[in-house]
C-alpha cells in the first residue's frame, strides 16, 4: 500500500462514517444536508441506486428517482459531510453493476424485482 492509500485509509477511519451495505438496484433514502440562508435542514432523496463507485475516499453512488414524470439522477460522494445518512428501503434483484439502461425506461418496464431473503433449509 503506497502513501496516498494509507492517508486515505486514515482519513476514512477519522471520519468514522458508517453506511449500510447497499448495491445497485436497491431503493434508498439519502438524507442530505441543505443550507438555506443561515439555517441547515435535512432533505430526503429517495430513489434507486443505479451505480456505485468504490474508490476508497473518492467512493460515490448515483441515485435515480422520478420527479413529476421526469427522471432525476443525483451522484453522492459516500464520505461527504453533506450526506447525513443512508437508509435502505428495499433490496433489488439485478444482474448488472451499472443500471444505466433504466434511463431509457419509464413505467412498468423500469421496475426492479425485489430480492427476497433466503429461506432456511430445515
From Swiss-Prot:
One of its GO terms (cellular component) is cytosolic large ribosomal subunit. The keyword Ribosomal protein applies. Transmembrane segments: none annotated. GO terms for molecular function: structural constituent of ribosome. PROSITE patterns: RIBOSOMAL_L19. One of its GO terms (biological process) is translation. The keyword Ribonucleoprotein applies. Keywords: Ribonucleoprotein, Ribosomal protein. PANTHER family: LARGE RIBOSOMAL SUBUNIT PROTEIN BL19M (PTHR15680:SF9), RIBOSOMAL PROTEIN L19 (PTHR15680). This protein is located at the 30S-50S ribosomal subunit interface and may play a role in the structure and function of the aminoacyl-tRNA binding site. Belongs to the bacterial ribosomal protein bL19 family. This is Large ribosomal subunit protein bL19. It comes from Chromobacterium violaceum (strain ATCC 12472 / DSM 30191 / JCM 1249 / CCUG 213 / NBRC 12614 / NCIMB 9131 / NCTC 9757 / MK). The lineage of its organism: Bacteria, Pseudomonadati, Pseudomonadota, Betaproteobacteria, Neisseriales.
